[in-house]
Amino acid sequence: MVNKKIIVLSIFISLSISIFPQLRLANIFGDGMVLQRNDSINIWGWSKSGDKVSVFFQGDEYNTIANNDGKWLVQTKHYLAGGPFSLKIKTQKEEIYLKDIYVGDVWLCSGQSNMHMKMKSVKENYPEEFNLTENKNIRFIEVPSQLNFNKSEQDIKNSNWSSLNSKSIFKFSAAAYFFAKDLQPKLNIPIGLILSAVGGSPVESWICEKSALNYKSVAKRLNEAKQEGFLENLHKKDKENRQNWFLEAEEKLLNNDVFYQPKSFDHTYKYKWFPFHKHTGVYWFKKEFYLDENSLSDTRLYLGKIGDSDSTFLNGKYIGNTLNRYVDREYWFSPKLLKKGNNTIEIKVYNFRWRAGFMFGDIMEFKSNQTNFRLMDEWYFADLCEMPPLKAGENKFWRPVGLFNGMIAPLSKLKLKGVIWYQGEANAKKDLAFAYRDRFSSLIKDWRSLFEKKDLPFLFVQLPNYLKSN
């Protein structure tokens, strides 16, 4: 019986070796990618230790040997902008073939939610941008979120390149899209955009450990993050705090007999006054609208962002909720919920920390196949209960160094034209803003060192605030 198990295990191992490929490229490489023009190009990956790896590009052949860890890298000559080309990598037993490769300028696009915000979030403000034909000279890839506080990751998580078209535009970074839209026709070359950004992240998340250790408070937060179980315990505590806050709020609503709806609406609030600064707690918003007919389809409410969490109802029926103040609300619903004549939207809002209600500047709209109209005028609202602010939670992505190691360091061999950076709200507080000028300088030095380009261009937006300061 033991011998049979050994035989079966041996067969499984031999099959694994033959079935699963040893040769692979770093995940930044793929069909449709853009490589940097007028510079040597690094192409790298992994194979079986000792394998001869051959790379074929534009009629040229490059050869190398995989090292003891299986890593390999070839460096090509300089190439002019152009495409499409193919890229072939092979060993004696395996082959990888990539198609639709272009050579042009490659830009790394990083920061917090300013850079991460997708075109789908600005569609209501820029509808004309979505009526486009395919532009193969603008390409985009997003680096998936990944953290490491102890060492640099060797590779990013799997992702794919996309050329710009009417479908892919929705997932493009809005800031990066408008940057490329302006730049590409002026240069008349392919533009590659690599998005590596995380909402809410401070500058400290994107610097290397050596730089982090130069700042006492930053080094302390990094050392805490390295401790086993530390972040998990913080997350658990944050979750408990949030649950307790909700339970206390619900108890107050029940005691005041306003859990399901307010007794009356005593106030109106103009859209231009939002968000307002009364207090944290629970509010109820209400608006009526009139329909001449009810034979509609593709019905939805677009409400923009709401501070902080909402539950939304149409004619007394629940149609959706969102917990995050930074996410645009778009709620699709059955047209059967509508009626000819007066209809009512009601929104129950839980405000945890600051600035309750709608966000001035966001589009608010009723949409359907036949009729669209804006909802950006007066709303009734009721103040249901006051609550103490919920203590700010801990986000693991905001700890120092983790994003540098996880989402920048794995790209270190890539050749770039430059970096566009849009970040700052997370560092705009009084105790952080002054330190930002030094820490952002550290980031630029870190990245230039990482990519081995001492004059790597950095185009950046400085310390934008979130909403008005008052």
Regions found by a protein language model. Give the residues of each.
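Active-site neighborhood of glycoside hydrolase catalytic domains
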Residues: R399-G418, Y422-F460
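A conserved hydrophobic secondary-structure block that centers on an alpha-helix together
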Residues: D155-L195, G200-P202, D298, D308-S309, ...
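An acidic-aromatic loop/edge-strand motif
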Residues: I96-S163, I194-P275, N342-L416
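Aromatic-lined ligand-binding clefts that engage carbohydrates, nucleic acids, or primary amines
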Residues: W44, F289-G316, I345-I347
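Beta-strand-rich ligand-recognition modules
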Residues: G59-G82, K305, T312-I363
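Ser/Thr-rich low-complexity repeats and stalk/linker segments
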Residues: Q22, I28-V103, R353-F358
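Short beta-strands within extracellular/lumenal beta-sheet-rich domains
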Residues: N27-D31, H279-D292, R329-Y331, N405
